[in-house]
Structure formats: structure tokens, C-alpha cells
UniProtKB/Swiss-Prot annotation:
Pfam families documented for this protein: DUF4532 (PF15046)
Biological source species: Homo sapiens (Human)
Tissue and organ distribution: Expressed in Testis.
InterPro entries with a match to the protein in the record: DUF4532
Upper classification of the organism: Eukaryota, Metazoa, Chordata, Craniata, Vertebrata
Basic residues composition bias: residue spans: 294-305
Region Disordered, residue ranges: 284-305
Name of the molecule in the record: Testis-expressed protein 52
Domain of life: Eukaryota
Amino acid sequence: MASNRQRSLRGPSHPSHMEEPFLQMVQASESLPPSQTWAQREFFLPSESWEFPGFTRQAYHQLALKLPPCTDMKSKVRQRLIHPWKGGAQHTWGFHTWLDVCRLPATFPTQPDRPYDSNVWRWLTDSNAHRCPPTEHPIPPPSWMGQNSFLTFIHCYPTFVDMKRKKQVIFRTVKELKEVEKLKLRSEARAPPLDAQGNIQPPASFKKYRHISAGGRFEPQGLQLMPNPFPNNFARSWPCPNPLPHYQEKVLKLALLPSAPLSQDLIRDFQTLIKDRTALPLHHLSKAQASKSPARKRKRRPGHF
């Protein structure tokens, strides 16, 4: 009896046959792979490469997935985006002539030229332009739309079948025209249109802005802009020799800078050009009124002055 009690207290030296399956299950659960989500179990992982059966990917198929090589131009563009370019390109001397001519009224022949003389604008800078050969690419004659605008075309021609759609297009066009008038008024404040004598055509409500100094402050007797001299044929591509800030700089890009007056030589050549031609303004003056927003009256709180 004593020997049987000692055996029962010590326990069996080896596990019984009933406990072996339980131990195997515990050991198997320890070696199981980590738990996966439902998407990982049901769908293919994008990182794993797999191919359709019966199809072997060739080397040229990788060209569609391979990015194009980085060229020198692309690397320069990326560097400019990261580090902005400090030095800006200088405009040429002849660039001012192009700007000044664009401010003058457009000239139209009294009788249509056949063929159209494309050298007419060269007379402003070259007195012997009529002897020069015509331009390599023929310039079409100028067109004058007048009142024949897109809005008139919508009203006169039965373009739209749906009247509701037609009203929407007319409303959008009128809205765009009003916005154009506002932008035109801002442009006229900075660079007003000129007549054939080079004088400003001020509207009834035109306001002359004071000059702005280099620091961006208003000064009544500030920097006076001088007209740009006429370059000859050899100096048109040279950098502009005028050291004064006569052109819009980055610092004063949004400032109300007045335009430089025109050169007297350019006005004299233009008046000679329009003797047998009709001078019409580039565009009609803006009919938009400057917005006069009343100043907000601040209410004083009791105890504050």
C-alpha cells in the first residue's frame, strides 16, 4: 500500500497516451504563421509578382513600366523648382519698340492692299522698309470685328435649339464681358490708350496715379520715367542700356507703375505712316466704373475712444 501511495504522489514518469494529442496541438499552435487580414487571405498581395498562366513576360514588356531617363533639362527644371532662379533674363532694347508700337492705334488702309503689304509696320523703325523684301511668312491683313462679337452671333443665328441652354450661354458671355471691362479699366489706369499724336485719351473718370519709388512708396516728386530711345538695326538685340527701373520688376510687379512716354521719333514716323491710312483705336475705352466701396464705419464700444 505504501509503495502504491508513493507512486501516485510522484506521478507518472512519462505522459499517458491520452495527453499526447493535446501536447501536439499546443506545439502545432506555436508554429502557426502570424494571423492575416481578410484582404490578405482573399486577394493577391500587390508586392508579390504573379503572371497569367500560359504567358511569360518578356524583356520588352518592362519598357512600359520603366520610367524615362532623367535628362539634363529635367534635372535643371527640378533644381529651379527647389532653388528659385535669382538672376532674371534681361529684355532687349528692341523689346521696348514692340511695346510702344502696341500702344498706338491700329492703321488700316483706305483701300485693301492686294496683296497685303506686310512691311507697313517696318516703316516705324526703318525708312527704307518699302525696299525690303516681304516677310518670309506672309502676314494676313488686319481684321476689324467691331460689333460683330460672339454675343451678337448668338442672338442673331439660331445656333441653339434649347432656349434654356441659350439663355445660360448668353448669361455666361455677358458675365465674362463685364469681367473683361473691369480688367480693361485696370490696364488703362496703368497704360492708358494713346491717339495718333501720342497723347493720352483719358475717360471722364480717369485718375492719374502718382509715381512710385523704388521702395514701393508713393512719392509726389518721385522717379520720372524717360522715353526709351530708338535702337538701330544692329542694337535691337542688345540688352537695354537704360539703367532706370523703367520696366516692371519682380518687386513692383503688382504696383501701379505708369508706362514710359513714347519716343518723339516713333510718333513722327507713325504720323507719316497714317497719312494715307485710317487710324482706329485698338479697343474701345472701358465702360466699367471704378468700384467705390464705402469705408466701413467702426462702432465705438463704450469706454473706448
